[in-house]
Structures are given as C-alpha cells and as structure tokens.
Amino acid sequence: MRKWLSCLMVLVMLTVPMIQADAAEKAVLALGADLSADQRAVVLSEMGISEEEAASYQTIYITNDMEHQYLDSSIGASVVGRHALSSVLLIPQESGAGLSVETHNINYCTIAMYKNALLTAGVQDAKVIVAAPSQVSGTAALIGAVKAYETYSGEEVAQDAFETATNELVLTGELMEELDSEQISDLIAYLKQKVAENGLDDPDKLEELVKQAAKEMDMSLTDAQISQLVDLLLKLSKLDIDAGKLVSQAKELYDKLDDLGIELDTKKVGNFVTRFVSSIWELIQGFMSRD
C-alpha cells in the first residue's frame, strides 16, 4: 500500500512542473510596435525574461492604430498619443489558478484596475505582466493583454465585452483622480459582482445599489459619478459574466471586500484545484492510518 501511495505522490509532484512548463510554452508576448531595440531590451528586462526566452514565446505586436481604434472614443486621440510602447506578457496558468497581474513602469493604471477590466473582458487563469520602457499611464496595455489572451485561447473576445472593459478601466481612472484608487476598484468589483449575481438591469435599482454600496464603504459620490457608474453597470448587465468566476479569478480582491464587512453571496465559491488537492491528501492520510 505504501509503495502505491509513494507512486501517487511522485506522480502528483511531477505533474505540477509539467503543467508549469506547458504554460510557459504557450505564453504570448504582446509588444508595442514602436519599441526601439533599446526600449525592447528594457521591457524584456522589466518582465524578467531574456531574449532567448522571448524568442520561444508566440509574439504579436500592438500598433498605435489599434490603440486608437479601441481607446479614442473613451479617452480621446490626443491622450492615446502616436507611439505604441506598452507591452504585455501573458502566461497561461492551470485551471482554477486565477488571474494575477504585475506592472513595471506603469504610473496610472493599478493592478486592481487591470484585474477588474480583464475579468470583464473574459480573461482568466493567467499571469499578466505589464511593462513599458519608461513611465507611462498603461491604459493601452489592456489592448495588449486582451489580444494576447485571444492569441493563446484561439477565441476572439466579444466586441461589447472589450468595449465595456475599456470603459471600465477609463472610468476607474477618471474617478481615481478625485477619490481613493483602492476604494474605487473595490467599489466597482463589488458592484460588478452584485450585477452578475442578481441579473440587475434596472437603472433605478442600479442607482440604489451604487448609493448603498458607497454608503457601506464610507464613500461620498456626486450625482454625476453615480450616473457614470450606473451607465457602466448597465453595460455590464448585458454581458454574460459568471459571478462565481469573478470570485475564483480575483480571490484576493473579493476576500478584501469580505474583510471590509461587505458580504458576497458567492463566498462559498472556492478554488477547485485547492479543494481537489486537499481531498487527495485526506485520502492518502486515511490509507496510511490503516497500516
């Protein structure tokens, strides 16, 4: 019996690096098309990868035209600029691992902002590294992350989901100029969760939800800000967002909401992989106790 258990444990331990290696092989590098050779070297260094490693990844290029296509209506052509520099490395993770984000030389978009917007676009189970050769806002990096995910998954992100994700990122940034950035990200995450859970699509009910959530978080919103959030929630209500996936993909964010005393009906949603490994370990312990 112990020999069988030893073999099982070896198999489990061997499977983990195999999954990680497979994920690395499928990684997608989305580079700003206007990077110079020196800027490219800086970006790769910030991402923690060598030229040799980069050569093994599937590489796509994000052009300035693409940035204007997706961002002009939200932030204006002059803000988008004329050079595509923001770059993204997307490394797929095993199912249930969730979505993680790290940033380098990004001075405007926060990790929580990226997470919220990427979840809206449908990105999941991935490690996303956003980097630029020098300090930039990072708004355009959302395009690189989504396009990298499309390349990896082989599925195109729905246009309405992409547009809503962009709108969410931009609105979060605008509100962040007048309010606390963490609070805004927490508020939008909570509102999105409630819309997904309850299928809310009535403007009056959404306005009531925004006001109640702001009160619980001790935030003071103007009528204009409330209206902007309601407009965003109406767009989110038209998307097929899975409430359970929101929690499992951004567990730290939703755990934080719980710590703030803001309850989510989907707290019962756990990480399947964690529960599976735990069950296997309990089974092994049960067998060993019989010897």
Q: What kind of feature is each model-predicted range?
A:
Residues 2-22, 280, 284:
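Sec-dependent N-terminal signal peptides of Gram-positive bacterial secreted proteins and lipoproteins
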Residues 26-27, 92-100, 122-127, 169-170, ...:
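Acidic/histidine-rich, surface-exposed loop or edge segments in extracytoplasmic proteins
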Residues 28-32, 87-91, 98-103, 127-131, ...:
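Soluble periplasmic/extracytoplasmic beta-strand elements of cell-envelope proteins
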Residues 32-36, 75-76, 93-95, 104-106, ...:
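Solvent-exposed coil/turn segments that connect beta secondary-structure elements
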Residues 219-291:
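Charged, long alpha-helical assembly modules
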